[in-house]
Design a protein with these regions (language model features):
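Conserved core of the PLP fold type I
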Residues: 1-142, 152-172
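Generic enzyme active-site microenvironment
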Residues: 146
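Walker B catalytic acidic pair
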Residues: 149
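Active-site PLP attachment segment
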Residues: 161-198
Length: 198
């Protein structure tokens, strides 16, 4: 197989990821050792040593291990506000603070069916997230938005859970959207380590 993975596998991973909700724009994939491998490649390729990666305060501990091994660290924002909704203010403040310190920012959002809370960002939440990163892009910052979709197939009907993906069409050139695809959960291929970074 080629280093990037078999073309048929990569096209299947893209098709499964988007399930008819593929955003307009350039798409490519590389095979990885599960979703964890996708996360690791993203951190290795897009995070400068010493920089911080942003995710929510409820997060999979392996994010921290990956960042530490690659010379970066995890910074968190408070996921929920007082009404148990996505904390738009905390997210925006954290993005703003990190963009004042670094030229590039990788943001990891584990959604839909966030582990461990089960929370899925709503269409309105995604609008806020994208408004926040677009504001930083206007200042010349490079933003990588990594969506960890490990549990997407447990979040509801496949087309409904992927509707947000079409919001990624037409983003500024300095916003890169990435997906950590995994066959470990929904396909029960955990030991097979089948994943892709899309």
């Amino acid at each position: 197989a080629p280093i990037s993975g078999l073309p048929e596998y990569l096209e299947a991973a893209i098709d499964i990821t988007f399930a008819g909700k593929r955003p307009a724009g350039y798409l490519a994939a590389v095979a990885t050792a599960g979703g964890t491998g996708a996360l690791r490649i993203a951190v290795d390729d897009y995070v400068e040593r010493g920089d911080q990666v942003l995710t929510s305060d409820w997060f999979w501990g392996t994010y921290n291990i990956i960042c530490q091994e690659l010379g970066s660290s995890v910074t968190t924002f408070t996921l929920f506000d007082e009404a148990n909704n996505f904390n738009h203010t905390a997210f925006s403040e954290a993005v703003d603070a990190l963009c004042k310190k670094q030229d590039s920012l990788l943001i990891i959002l584990n959604t839909p069916a966030h582990n461990p809370t089960g929370y899925s960002l709503s269409a309105e939440d995604w609008d806020h997230v994208l408004d926040t990163v677009k504001a930083q892009a206007k200042t010349g910052k490079k933003i990588q938005l990594l969506v960890d979709i490990a549990y997407i197939d447990f979040a509801g009907e496949k087309h409904a859970t992927r509707a947000f993906m079409q919001k990624f069409a037409g983003l500024p050139e300095n916003i890169l959207t990435l997906f950590a695809f995994s066959m470990s959960k929904a396909y029960t291929f955990y030991g097979q380590r089948c994943g892709a970074l899309i």
